[in-house]
Amino acid sequence: SVTALQEAAAVAGIVNGGVYHSPTIIKSAVDGHGEPSEIPKTTTRRVISQRASEEVRDMMENVVSTAKGRPIPDYRMGAKTGTAQRIDPECHCYHGYISSFIAVAPIEKPRILTYVVINQPTNGHTGTAVAQPAARQLMSVALPRYGVQPSTDKARKEPLEYQP
């Protein structure tokens, strides 16, 4: 299993031209004496090719662009849904769901990533039905708040077709 931060960092590496950047969740730190403490530097490494990254972004954009009511106006986005059955440790049987939705925008040069995970949802069980509304709301606030410019190219209208 992985943490939400590990999952988000992995997806960011895939859509970021195939280059993984280790996540940093703190800006500064001090030791017990109030002295500044060194924070480990972010490391980077290539995890997939640039071409593979572009193909994954195309597929992720297709998830959003073919769904009605999902895109945020003026921004091309990409997303991946997730739905998993939970295993009950007492009976070792399936009991309930974990639903998720991870979105990146703008898809042509990702700047913002949102990852929403709902444990034991009560209003459905698919990532699209349960987690997507919160991810969309977060993204619609974060994009303008952090000064991310709208997409200049329009998303393709036709669905993506696999070409081996």
Language model region names:
Residues 1-43, 51, 60-149:
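Active-site beta-strand/loop architecture of penicillin-binding DD-peptidases
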